Design a protein with these regions (language model features):
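Conserved RecA-like ASCE P-loop NTPase motor core of nucleic-acid helicases/translocases
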Residues: 1-4, 25-27, 176-182
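Switch/connector loops and helix/strand junctions flanking conserved nucleotide-binding motifs
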Residues: 8-10, 33-37, 60-61, 76-79, ...
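Flexible beta-alpha connector loops of hexameric P-loop NTPases
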Residues: 25-33, 75-86, 151-157
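SF2 helicase catalytic motif II
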Residues: 44-50, 55-104
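Conserved motor-coupling elements within RecA-like helicase/translocase cores
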Residues: 14-51, 59-65, 121
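Conserved Walker A/P-loop ATP-binding site and its immediately adjacent core
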Residues: 1-17
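Conserved interdomain linker/interface between the two RecA-like ATPase lobes of SF2 helicase motors
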Residues: 89-185
Length: 185
């Protein structure tokens, strides 16, 4: 399961190349009704061995379900806010428990709830914590992080002077800058 609708096409290619003998289908809201029905039936019959999808995929019946993977488990996109409210991540954990199969909750920045379930209190861990031994790119270091107190460095059009200076110096060197904002729209 993936949090965003734009992820399945990229991941679908990689998974299909890695598991060429297994039929893979995707399930997400961008599929037309006919394609979604075809993919759902393939999963339900067991013809499709791998289902890749957004939170909708958690409801797909699969006769020989053996593993559930939730990529970026911390992402709020797994929570349905309208109508019937649910957390697809929590439903995936429940389904795995009911089917006595493993579930992998993957994240470089796990939710506090998952972190607490993995690190536990006095030996009461509910999840088994696995960590990567190194960086995805060998030799890559961690980025430099600087916290800026906006009570001291005032905002100018939403950006602080140190941030504006850092962007200007990168642009002067012909480099790019990417700003992540914590809101949508």
């Amino acid at each position: 399961m993936v949090p965003e609708i734009n992820i399945p096409p990229q991941l679908e290619t990689r998974i299909a190349a890695r598991f060429p003998a297994a039929r893979l289908v995707s399930l997400h809201s961008e599929l037309g009704d006919a394609a979604r029905s075809r993919h759902w039936r393939a999963a339900h019959s067991g013809e499709a061995r791998i289902v890749l999808g957004t939170r909708l995929a958690v409801f797909t019946p699969m006769p020989v379900l053996g593993l559930i993977i939730v990529d970026e488990e911390h992402d709020t996109s797994f929570k349905q806010q309208d109508g019937l409210r649910y957390s697809a991540r929590d439903l995936a954990v429940y389904r795995a428990r009911q089917n006595d199969i493993p579930v992998v909750l993957g994240s470089a920045t796990p939710s506090l709830e998952s972190w607490a379930n993995a690190t536990g209190n006095g030996g009461r861990e509910r999840y088994h914590l696995l960590s990567l031994g190194g960086r995805a790119v060998p030799g890559a270091g961690l980025p430099a992080i600087r916290c800026i107190d906006t009570r001291v460095d005032r905002l100018h059009d939403g950006l602080t002077t140190p941030l504006l200076s850092a962007i200007e110096s990168r642009l002067a060197r012909g480099e790019q800058s990417l700003l992540f904002l914590n809101r949508r729209g």
